């Protein structure tokens, strides 16, 4: 994904006030939804480019198109994008590249690939965003479309290439401060709103109850399985980090012991009028340990937090569906008895 950004564009510094909100046309939303649902049937990750323009502090997304599948080795992805945007320009359609979109995996989109791709996009195209579409949640009747941008701290950390614990503490970066969510608004034309109102009136009464389905076993099972996997990964990261701390503590203890011994020997040499040995000779024997990369652990922590929130929210929605279904059933029975 990273190579899909315009590598030759001038890199600019990120700013907190670049984009205040994202306005997405209904046509672009429908194209993203259609693409994501088609790819979800094949268990593939749907990704595509967002086209539009920036007006004041608003990023307007007016069109989009899917990326070619990565399995096609004969396809030049950058040339494909340039060709599509060139042809859109010929028919007077917004062709400015303003970001990209992708579907989410079991309701959780935070990953190392997402972070790296958005870093390359945002340092090439300052106003770019990533729009994430949750196919599972949307299929249950809750349209889930979210826009994200990397925070300035995350960009600085990635630019430095330093993912040590000290770097995370210095920049005050955690899983909650890697991405900043940008409010997203869906805009339709007045004619589209009128048509939607008419279609809503034509919808049979029973069809509106499809989203009250209480079959939640599969969704909870997938969420719990993913949560357990992420907890296991975080445990392995914690074990590796604890081993690193133990090795560092042991090395520091040995170094202090060696320095104390050298100080005593130097005192004896000084009393005898002999030259002392520099401490650097002892310090050279203890090479500093390389700190482990904490980026993976941070991302895994964010995934665990997201899964926990989704499970809690899903359970609340299921309880609400239960009470709504009960009320509708009682009203239906009362209507039939009359």
Curated annotation (Swiss-Prot):
<dbReference type="GO" id="GO:0005852">
    <property type="term" value="C:eukaryotic translation initiation factor 3 complex"/>
</dbReference>
<dbReference type="GO" id="GO:0008237">
    <property type="term" value="F:metallopeptidase activity"/>
</dbReference>
<dbReference type="InterPro" id="IPR000555">
    <property type="entry name" value="JAMM/MPN+_dom"/>
</dbReference>
<dbReference type="InterPro" id="IPR045810">
    <property type="entry name" value="eIF3h_C"/>
</dbReference>
<dbReference type="GO" id="GO:0016282">
    <property type="term" value="C:eukaryotic 43S preinitiation complex"/>
</dbReference>
<dbReference type="GO" id="GO:0033290">
    <property type="term" value="C:eukaryotic 48S preinitiation complex"/>
</dbReference>
<dbReference type="InterPro" id="IPR050242">
    <property type="entry name" value="JAMM_MPN+_peptidase_M67A"/>
</dbReference>
<dbReference type="Pfam" id="PF19445">
    <property type="entry name" value="eIF3h_C"/>
</dbReference>
<dbReference type="InterPro" id="IPR037518">
    <property type="entry name" value="MPN"/>
</dbReference>
<feature type="domain" description="MPN">
    <location>
        <begin position="22"/>
        <end position="154"/>
    </location>
</feature>
<comment type="function">
    <text>Component of the eukaryotic translation initiation factor 3 (eIF-3) complex, which is involved in protein synthesis of a specialized repertoire of mRNAs and, together with other initiation factors, stimulates binding of mRNA and methionyl-tRNAi to the 40S ribosome. The eIF-3 complex specifically targets and initiates translation of a subset of mRNAs involved in cell proliferation.</text>
</comment>
<protein>
    <recommendedName>
        <fullName>Eukaryotic translation initiation factor 3 subunit H</fullName>
    </recommendedName>
</protein>
<dbReference type="GO" id="GO:0003743">
    <property type="term" value="F:translation initiation factor activity"/>
</dbReference>
<comment type="similarity">
    <text>Belongs to the eIF-3 subunit H family.</text>
</comment>
<dbReference type="InterPro" id="IPR027524">
    <property type="entry name" value="eIF3h"/>
</dbReference>
<keyword id="KW-0396">Initiation factor</keyword>
<comment type="subunit">
    <text>Component of the eukaryotic translation initiation factor 3 (eIF-3) complex. The eIF-3 complex interacts with pix. Interacts with mxt.</text>
</comment>
<dbReference type="Pfam" id="PF01398">
    <property type="entry name" value="JAB"/>
</dbReference>
<dbReference type="GO" id="GO:0001732">
    <property type="term" value="P:formation of cytoplasmic translation initiation complex"/>
</dbReference>
<keyword id="KW-0963">Cytoplasm</keyword>
<keyword id="KW-0648">Protein biosynthesis</keyword>
<dbReference type="GO" id="GO:0045747">
    <property type="term" value="P:positive regulation of Notch signaling pathway"/>
</dbReference>
């Amino acid at each position: 994904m990273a190579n899909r950004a315009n590598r030759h564009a001038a890199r600019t510094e990120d700013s907190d006030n670049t984009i205040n909100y994202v306005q997405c046309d209904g046509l672009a939303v429908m194209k993203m939804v259609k693409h994501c649902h088609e790819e979800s049937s094949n268990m593939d990750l749907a990704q595509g480019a967002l086209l539009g323009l920036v007006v004041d502090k608003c990023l307007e997304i007016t069109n989009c198109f899917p990326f070619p599948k990565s399995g096609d080795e004969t396809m030049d992805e950058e040339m494909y994008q340039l060709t599509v945007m060139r042809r859109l320009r010929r028919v007077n359609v917004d062709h400015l590249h303003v970001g990209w979109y992708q579907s989410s995996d079991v309701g959780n989109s935070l990953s190392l690939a997402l972070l790296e791709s958005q870093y390359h996009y945002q340092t090439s195209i300052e106003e770019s965003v990533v729009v994430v579409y949750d196919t599972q949640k949307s299929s249950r009747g809750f349209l889930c479309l979210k826009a994200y941008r990397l925070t300035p701290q995350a960009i600085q950390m990635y630019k430095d290439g330093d993912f040590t614990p000290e770097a995370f503490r210095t920049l005050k970066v955690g899983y909650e401060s890697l991405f900043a969510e940008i409010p997203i608004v869906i805009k339709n034309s007045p004619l589209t709103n009128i048509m939607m109102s008419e279609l809503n009136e034509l919808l049979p009464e029973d069809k509106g109850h499809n989203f009250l389905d209480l079959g939640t076993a599969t969704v909870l099972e997938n969420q719990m399985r993913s949560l357990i996997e992420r907890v296991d990964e975080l445990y392995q990261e914690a074990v590796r980090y604890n081993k690193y701390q133990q090795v560092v503590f042991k090395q520091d203890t040995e170094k202090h012991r060696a320095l104390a011994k050298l100080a005593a020997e130097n005192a004896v040499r000084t009393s005898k009028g002999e030259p002392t040995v520099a401490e650097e000779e002892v310090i050279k024997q203890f090479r500093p340990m390389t700190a482990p990369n904490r980026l993976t652990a941070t991302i895994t922590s964010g995934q665990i937090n997201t899964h926990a929130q989704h499970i809690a929210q899903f359970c609340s929605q299921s309880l609400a569906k239960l009470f709504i279904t009960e009320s509708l059933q009682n009203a239906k029975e009362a209507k039939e008895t009359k």
